[in-house]
């Protein structure tokens, strides 16, 4: 048994312009090489592009996209008796949001396009509508969990 206690969950601080935690979470995940100001620029440009494309509140589009991509269950590899099984596990809201943001950014980076702000805005709009690579990833994860339902008792 480990002697260490469990780490306290840190709550993300709100960003300076929109006062939104999701924006801060996105900024911290998009961050590369410690260039936080560049990460903020990318996010804010993407939010402006969403505003222009949809002509609605861009934060509601962001919230809707993240809610649409957030998985309920996932599979975890578990070694039982010499063979590895994919065991379906339920995911908490914080971990689900983190996964959703990671998938959205991954799908955005894979997209063809001019710059990251453009690609991110396109992916967020698609995810809010219920299409896009990130949504496909969520559905694939749910399918995997459903297929391996027989191993749920290994939790």
Swiss-Prot record:
Assembly, per entry: Part of the 30S ribosomal subunit.
Entry similarity comment: Belongs to the universal ribosomal protein uS7 family.
Keywords: Chloroplast, Plastid, Ribonucleoprotein, Ribosomal protein, RNA-binding, rRNA-binding
Listed SUPFAM superfamilies: Ribosomal protein S7
Protein name, per record: Small ribosomal subunit protein uS7c
Compartments where located: Plastid, Chloroplast
HAMAP family according to UniProt: Ribosomal_uS7_B
Species of the source: Trochodendron aralioides (Wheel tree)
CDD domains: uS7_Chloroplast
């Amino acid at each position: 048994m480990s002697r260490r206690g469990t780490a306290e969950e840190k709550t993300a601080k709100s960003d300076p312009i929109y006062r939104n935690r999701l924006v801060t979470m996105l900024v911290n995940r998009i961050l590369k090489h410690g260039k936080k100001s560049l990460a903020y620029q990318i996010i804010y440009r993407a939010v402006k592009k969403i505003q222009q494309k949809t002509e609605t509140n861009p934060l509601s589009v962001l919230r809707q996209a993240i809610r649409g991509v957030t998985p309920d269950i996932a599979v975890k590899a578990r070694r039982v008796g010499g063979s590895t099984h994919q065991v379906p596990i339920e995911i908490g809201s914080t971990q689900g949001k983190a996964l959703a943001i990671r998938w959205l950014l991954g799908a955005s980076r894979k997209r063809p396009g001019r710059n990251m702000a453009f690609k991110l805005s396109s992916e967020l709009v698609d995810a809010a509508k219920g299409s896009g690579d990130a949504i496909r990833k969520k559905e694939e994860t749910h399918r995997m969990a459903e297929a391996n339902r027989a191993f749920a008792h290994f939790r």
